[in-house]
């Protein structure tokens, strides 16, 4: 005759004991959104996003973006990455074998094939914007003063690019039948699996992606040069030509003095006025 302790030791079918045993060493469906998984995701977001702050301080001082411009640039990328992250979490639950492995495969595809697609998308959008002369939709330019509508429009364009990228990656995932791949099966600790999938691998890959994509979205030096060239052309059309000359004094021998065309005309008129009396004296034979 068995006591209550015997029943507990064996466990009832489908009871808590058997559930824990069957789930030991497995990354089960929904594990990515458990409390430990959410904690790792938040920690990853803070650490990875801090690389963008490091990137800003490493920019040359004459090209360093003001904090407001930097925030507008990086916030677009943060929104896009959040979309990709939650899309990967949703797609990871499509498999019953190992969601952690599927999330990791999705993430690595985003970091390789996805990076190329993002680059192509940003370049294609840039060509379209230049062709249509949509000034407010140029990535990294928000007007002077800053316009919230420009940021909203650029953010919407970037989300469209991310939707395109994620759709292509999902198609590749289906074609290659990678839903059945279980990369992390040799690892028995489910918390270690989550740490690898949500923190360790994504930290290095996300830092690289944030750094590179920020270069895609920020205002380029070529764009600045084009704007300056346009301003110079507009000034020349208005007739305000400018040239440089060397200073005549010894103390300022290495300095350059900017002289406008109007100043030159005033100097030439003054010299002409001084020469007129001399010419008249020569004409009448008077001593100069």
From Swiss-Prot:
Any one GO BP annotation for this protein: activation of store-operated calcium channel activity
Motif (GXXXG motif): 149-153
One family name in Pfam for this protein: STIMATE
Compartmental location: Endoplasmic reticulum membrane
Gene Ontology cellular component list: cortical endoplasmic reticulum; endoplasmic reticulum membrane; endoplasmic reticulum-plasma membrane contact site; membrane
Cytoplasmic side: 1-28, 215-288
Transmembrane segments: 29-49, 69-89, 102-122, 156-176, 194-214
UniProt-annotated stretches for the region Required for localization in the endoplasmic reticulum: 241-246
Subunit structure: Homooligomer. Interacts with STIM1.
Family (UniProt): Belongs to the STIMATE family.
Name of the protein: Store-operated calcium entry regulator STIMATE
């Amino acid at each position: 005759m068995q006591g209550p302790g015997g029943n507990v030791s064996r466990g009832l079918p489908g009871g808590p004991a058997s559930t824990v045993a069957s789930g030991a060493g497995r990354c089960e469906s929904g594990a990515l959104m458990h409390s430990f998984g959410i904690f790792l995701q938040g920690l990853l977001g803070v650490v990875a996003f801090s690389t963008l702050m490091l990137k800003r301080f490493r920019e040359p001082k004459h090209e360093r973006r003001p904090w407001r411009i930097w925030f507008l640039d990086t916030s677009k990328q943060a929104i896009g990455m959040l979309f990709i992250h939650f899309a990967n979490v949703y797609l990871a639950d499509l498999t019953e074998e190992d969601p952690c492995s599927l999330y990791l495969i999705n993430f690595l595809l985003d970091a390789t094939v996805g990076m190329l697609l993002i680059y192509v998308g940003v370049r294609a959008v840039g060509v379209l914007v230049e062709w249509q002369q949509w000034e407010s939709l140029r990535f990294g330019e928000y007007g002077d003063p800053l316009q919230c509508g420009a940021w909203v429009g650029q953010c919407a364009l970037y989300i469209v690019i991310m939707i395109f990228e994620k759709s292509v990656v999902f198609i590749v995932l289906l074609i290659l039948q990678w839903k059945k791949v279980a990369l992390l099966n040799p690892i028995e600790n489910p918390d270690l699996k989550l740490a690898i999938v949500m923190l360790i691998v994504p930290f290095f890959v996300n830092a690289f992606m944030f750094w590179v994509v920020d270069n895609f979205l920020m205002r380029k030096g070529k764009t600045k040069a084009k704007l300056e060239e346009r301003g110079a052309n507009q000034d020349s059309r208005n007739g305000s030509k400018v040239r440089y000359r060397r200073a005549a004094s010894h103390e300022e021998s290495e300095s350059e003095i900017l002289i406008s065309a109007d100043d030159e005309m005033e100097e030439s008129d003054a010299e002409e006025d001084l020469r007129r009396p001399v010419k008249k004296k020569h004409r009448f034979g008077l001593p100069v």
